[in-house]
UniProtKB/Swiss-Prot annotation:
Gene Ontology biological process: P granule organization; spermatid development; transposable element silencing by piRNA-mediated DNA methylation
Gene giving rise to this polypeptide: tdrd5
Annotated protein name in UniProt: Tudor domain-containing protein 5
Domain Tudor stretches: 523-581
InterPro entries associated with the record: LOTUS-like, OST-HTH/LOTUS_dom, SNase_OB-fold_sf, TDRD5_LOTUS_2, Tudor, Tudor_domain_containing
Keyword annotations from UniProtKB, A to Z: Cytoplasm, Developmental protein, Differentiation, Repeat, Spermatogenesis
Family assignment from sequence similarity: Belongs to the TDRD5 family.
Subcellular compartments: Cytoplasm
């Protein structure tokens, strides 16, 4: 019987039981009636339900829930067309009434009967009424301090104030009226035209007192200017009195600004004290009156070394002739009461060795310490302000706090940048204009990989289980009964996986975080740990299985066992905190069976998937064979347990064999390939772009080095060098690519020459050569230029000195006939053994490591286009002076040519 058939039969039986009950059944009664009528318990576990209420949630068309006055749940049936007649008969049934107890008494005995109501069952307690807890007293005081509250609005106002319902039963009260009767010492009830109102018995400090304190504090903080200007009316009306005031010795000995500065710190200290008192009054300490606090302080003060907490009630009764009102104030013990009075009393450990001996002492703030003698106020005018300023500062928390790191301002970098700006203004015109021309196209020496990213580490392998252990598992990916992946469920690791996926989704969903953790091309390699979101929703931990193409890679899902293709740009670095959890997908084999032939047929695989997938199974661990888990699978969701290996044998898809049968060596094993505690090979980190500051150029001038930014990577020393480039500031150049051209030296430049004059010509001579020059093979042959920059007084012109390129373009490549483009001579090597590729014969770069260009370098060809060419090669070089059509240009060149390209014919 399938689960759907079992659930349909259960719905029919439950409806029949509930329809026959006129007033419904409780969940427990329904369970007992089901077992007594059918003879077996309800199949809750077989259908995946934990209790009857979980089953009811899945049957909204059969059962409805009702709540009684005492909070019990009653289940009633929802009838259909087949149960209308039975419902009418059940509704006409008479309710069962208990027989009255008719006692025959003596003559004159009258039996008086009263209507009996069903009592509400509530938790019972002793005879004494409970005391109001201290925190509830404090909350009620805060609620009523805003003003009177109507009795009908007490619960709603309490929820709005504190964010939780007023549940008086958890404090031992039967009703709100009983709770209010216990709070009659500070709450009174008055009748008004709108109904009963609750208000405080005694006056309470208004809630806007802190605002008054802040207003008074602001007035006092601004008072020095007003007091200093107090003499201004007299001074304005009587200007001749100014010398008298300045010559008066009494006014000179007591300057007003120092006095007002002292009052500022005193005001801060008083403000903190008043705020602290307000906080204490809002807490549990506010439930104790000041009179009781003073009495307790006197009892403790009589004993210089403190009094034992066990003797405090006795001493209090001996001194004041009354018992200590602990329960009346809402406290359960003397220790709780003394702990709440932190502004008056303190608890310390006793001097003896007993740990349970506590002493109650009078509270003395630690901060109020006497000042040092040299800082104490004296008779002179110099020492008096210092001593008066130190004492409030030592007591006030505002002045004792250390300076925060966020408030610390570093002035040295600002000074350096200001000096650099000053030096830049004195520098020559070329450097100043280069900074403005390329403001954000330089390279930083800071790593582009986040510090908490998993770079070369491997994930932890799945946890090994003990033999003969029974575990709940989920079959995730199936290839055959001899090769599939399982994942353990209903354990701590499964819950950790769910929480981790939720955290990963919330983390990587931010665009800035996703862009920062984007996986560079250098790290796209087999075995690299990363994460990916296939449908842009949930992120999964993956390991790169194979680099399929330039845009796609195959990844292995370490927690689910799938291998799929994903886009290369969707890969992200995995944060280190998400690598602590071991891989959850375990490669497994079904023990005890083998295929009838050498391979498993498609019918056997589909049967195995039907028996295992989309349900929780019980796995019996047999053993491990080369990190493959050999196990038995059992389906306990049906009435009878179904063993998967026996079901395959019965249906004729397999034959029995020894439990250890399997060809593990021929299968892909991710545990040995991708997991472990070793690491992959280190990758030369690429550099992230940043704005080249003028400081770097000024420093390079001071060191007699070219003012340039270096972008070629050195694999041996790890340093970074960039080719120096100088650009005419009057040109707005588009980003152009690099091609191989012969050595050309530019001797002079003319500002009046159109830089794209050669591009707009229509002479059809250089069609194939143009296409060959812009191919992707020539992108690595970049030209290195060095720029000697000096002041305008020493060198009025800037001269390019290009270094020789790696390979010059021959005449055969420049012919007009369509020939095969010449590919750079490279040797095919094993990708696992990287060989340095020479770029410009001086910068070896490993294959696969990207070199990020700073800005488009200017090739010899572009230098010839941008200036007056002086060709030094053997013979005329006419190939670079003609172009077949403007449509052969790249989009950037066509945009730079502007409107002149429209006049070509």
């Amino acid at each position: 019987m399938t689960q759907d058939q079992l659930l349909a039969g259960l719905k029919k039986d439950v409806r029949s039981l509930l329809v026959s009950s006129k007033h419904g059944l409780t969940p427990e009664h329904l369970r007992r009636d089901y077992q007594s009528m059918l003879g077996f318990p309800m199949p809750l576990r077989l259908l995946g339900f934990r209790n009857v209420l979980d089953m009811v949630k899945e049957m909204p068309e059969v059962v409805r829930l009702e709540y009684q006055l005492d909070g019990n749940i009653i289940l009633k049936a929802i009838g259909d067309d087949t149960t209308k007649g039975i419902e009418e008969l059940v509704s006409k049934q008479r309710d069962h009434k208990p027989k009255p107890n008719n006692r025959k008494g003596k003559p004159g005995y009258f039996n008086i009967s009263y209507p009996r109501l069903q009592p509400v069952i509530l938790p019972r307690r002793g005879q004494a009424k409970p005391a109001l807890p201290a925190h509830l007293r404090s909350q009620l005081k805060q609620l009523l301090s805003h003003g009177p509250v109507r009795l009908s609005e007490l619960e709603s106002r309490y929820v709005a104030q504190f964010g939780k319902p007023l549940n008086v039963t958890q404090y031992g009260f039967f009703s709100i009226s009983e709770m209010l009767s216990a709070a009659m010492d500070f709450i009174i009830m008055q009748q008004s035209r709108t109904g009963s109102q609750l208000l405080l018995r005694s006056a309470v400090t208004p809630q806007n007192q802190p605002e008054n304190l802040m207003r008074r504090f602001s007035m006092q903080s601004t008072s020095p200017k007003q007091r200093l200007a107090g003499f201004s009316p007299k001074a304005s009306s009587l200007p001749e009195r100014r010398p008298e005031v300045s010559l008066d010795p009494s006014s000179v000995s007591k300057p007003e600004p120092v006095k007002e500065e002292q009052s500022f710190e005193e005001t801060v200290f008083k403000l903190e004290e008043e705020l602290r008192q307000q906080i204490l009054e809002k807490g549990t300490a506010g439930t104790v009156s000041q009179e009781l606090k003073e009495k307790l302080r006197k009892v403790v003060a009589e004993n210089g070394n403190g009094i034992s907490i066990h003797n405090l009630p006795t001493e209090y009764q001996r001194m004041h002739g009354e018992e200590l009102p602990v329960s009346q104030c809402g406290f359960l013990s003397v220790t709780e009461m003394v702990g709440a009075l932190s502004d008056t009393l303190a608890i310390q450990r006793g001097t003896d060795e007993s740990e349970s001996h506590w002493m109650v002492v009078e509270f003395k703030p630690i901060d109020t310490q006497p000042c040092e003698p040299e800082l104490s106020p004296g008779d002179g005018t110099t020492s008096s302000p210092t001593g008066e300023l130190q004492n409030p500062s030592s007591r006030a928390f505002y002045f004792s706090c250390p300076e925060s790191a966020w408030e610390h301002e570093e002035t040295e970098p600002l000074t350096d940048s200001q000096e650099s700006d000053a030096e830049l203004r004195v520098a020559n015109k070329t450097i100043h204009q280069m900074v403005n021309l390329f403001p954000e196209l330089m390279v930083s020496r800071v790593s582009a990989v986040p510090l908490d990213a998993v770079r070369c580490q491997k994930l932890k392998p799945p946890v090994h289980r003990k033999e003969r252990e029974l575990l709940p598992v989920l079959v995730e990916q199936t290839e055959s009964p001899s090769y599939f992946y399982i994942r353990f469920s209903q354990n701590k690791e499964a819950r950790a996986l769910e929480n981790m996926m939720i955290e990963m989704r919330s983390c990587y969903s931010y665009p800035d975080v996703a862009e920062r953790y984007r996986l560079p091309d250098a790290y796209v390699r087999p075995g690299q740990v990363c994460c990916v979101a296939p449908r842009d929703m949930w992120f999964y931990r993956v390991v790169i299985h194979e680099v399929f193409s330039e845009t796609e890679v195959k990844v292995y899902y370490v927690d689910y066992g799938d291998i799929t293709k994903v886009e290369r740009h969707s890969l992200r670095f995995l944060k280190a905190c998400y690598a602590d959890l071991p891989a959850q997908a375990v490669p497994a084999m079904l023990a005890g069976v083998r295929p009838i032939t050498n391979i498993w047929p498609a019918s056997a695989v589909s049967c195995f998937q039907r028996l295992c997938c989309e349900r929780t199974l019980v796995a019996g661990v047999h053993s491990y064979q080369e990190d493959f888990l050999l196990l038995f699978l059992c389906d306990t969701n049906t009435e009878e347990d179904v063993y998967v290996h026996l079901a395959l044998i019965q249906e004729g898809h397999a034959q029995p064999c020894s439990a250890a049968y399997g060809l593990v060596s021929e299968k892909f094993n991710p545990v040995t390939s991708y997991f472990g505690y070793d690491q992959l090979e280190d990758v030369k980190e690429s550099l992230s772009p940043f704005s080249c500051s003028p400081d770097a150029e000024i420093d390079s001038q001071g060191n007699d080095s070219p003012s340039s930014c270096r972008t070629a990577s050195n694999s041996e020393s790890g340093e970074t060098n960039l080719a120096s480039i100088d650009v005419d500031p009057n040109l707005d150049l588009p980003p152009l690519e690099v091609i191989n051209v012969p050595d050309v030296n530019t001797a002079a430049k003319s500002e009046n020459v159109n830089p794209f004059e050669a591009l707009v010509r229509k002479d059809p001579l250089f069609n194939s050569e143009w296409d060959q020059g812009w191919t992707a093979e020539d992108k690595t042959d970049e030209t290195k230029f060095e720029l000697d920059v000096s002041t305008e007084q020493s060198k009025p012109e800037t001269v390019y000195t290009p270094s020789p390129v790696q390979a010059a373009v021959g005449k055969q490549q420049l012919c007009a006939s369509p020939v095969e483009p010449k590919v750079n001579a490279t040797t095919c090597v094993n990708p696992h053994n990287p060989v340095p590729i020479q770029i410009n014969c001086s910068y070896p770069v490993l294959p696969g490591v990207p070199v990020y260009p700073v800005k488009p370098p200017i090739s010899q060809f572009m230098m010839q286009l941008l200036g007056n060419p002086v060709y030094q090669g053997p013979g005329p070089n006419t190939a670079f002076q003609h172009l077949t059509s403007p449509l052969a240009l790249r989009p950037a060149a066509r945009m730079s040519a502007g409107g002149q390209i429209l006049h070509w014919s």
